[in-house]
Curated annotation (Swiss-Prot):
Its main location: cytoplasm. PANTHER family: PEPTIDYLPROLYL ISOMERASE. This is Peptidyl-prolyl cis-trans isomerase FKBP4. The lineage of its organism: Eukaryota, Metazoa, Chordata, Craniata, Vertebrata. Inhibited by FK506.
Amino acid sequence: MTAEEMKATESGAQSAPLPMEGVDISPKQDEGVLKVIKREGTGTEMPMIGDRVFVHYTGWLLDGTKFDSSLDRKDKFSFDLGKGEVIKAWDIAIATMKVGEVCHITCKPEYAYGSAGSPPKIPPNATLVFEVELFEFKGEDLTEEEDGGIIRRIQTRGEGYAKPNEGAIVEVALEGYYKDKLFDQRELRFEIGEGENLDLPYGLERAIQRMEKGEHSIVYLKPSYAFGSVGKEKFQIPPNAELKYELHLKSFEKAKESWEMNSEEKLEQSTIVKERGTVYFKEGKYKQALLQYKKIVSWLEYESSFSNEEAQKAQALRLASHLNLAMCHLKLQAFSAAIESCNKALELDSNNEKGLFRRGEAHLAVNDFELARADFQKVLQLYPNNKAAKTQLAVCQQRIRRQLAREKKLYANMFERLAEEENKAKAEASSGDHPTDTEMKEEQKSNTAGSQSQVETEA
């Protein structure tokens, strides 16, 4: 039964009582959720915890009274499975469906709205019947940018709510697949942030940080979150390869959070992490270096209990971290982020040579030539011997000249076209294709008189 057939079936009020029938799919086998498949779905895959699912549905009370339907709104309903966003019966039943499947779900009150009901349409202790059609489902996007680069599908939920943080020690079992071929199978204990040393993709560590103890998940990685344009020769992974990992987070020990460290510990850890970040940067592991420098900023930025001597050390570490973050962002071609990091550095030292120069580079990369020129000019004003700034300033001047030449040519062509159109209009007017000035004036007088008469009549 399609969504359209569902609509036809439920058009008009149903007054006949609905039967209690179906297979018991409730976890306790207490007949709290009964399911009848009305149309089989396709394929073998079913939604997993955290998947975004898209359905059409109609709901009735047991006496046949319809109380809701997505078909009436002509818009599919979507939610994240297993997250408690819908009644318990839905989280249970829709996890058993395949794409294209239509089923009837009968839900006892304890799996629906319970003793409270959902006034005014659903009374207390109501047993409900739904007809549901599953259209699609997709895994949970774990990226900040929501670009689909890290997709997780939870096979088994973990314990509690705690998750590994940056620097946590984790124990995992993993299997890596490229085009369904196993290329990596290991059990590891390592520190989050050090995974690249163990040939683990950046995106895999980010996924582990979103897992709970005991969780089993499947993680899909796009190339930019896997082994990128280089690939991984050790595993015979070619450039720009998409990967799949099956992960089991066995256990973890969280690293100390910023609020758990005193000022002395923060400075000590920041120095260690800065050195680690520098090593990563020199090895070309810019994403890993980025994480180290971000730690320093998070530890020191809002600390107010430093002594005068500690405050000076903290400021130097913060300045170096923002400058290094800017350099990492430049290498990763994240130019807006590079500008932001430079601005943070220049808030601490407004005449900082590296901050001004790197901001100029970022502005130049996004074709903001005037802003780039201003930064390079200031570098040379403060540091006249900076040869790189002289070179980049010359590049800016050249780009600005080219831009002005293009704009001049564009405007010249525009004015030329306008002149041609004006001459064409004059030629048509003189050939009698358009009314003469006298005719236009007479018509205008006539229209004005008519309008005035209409206004006076309406008034």
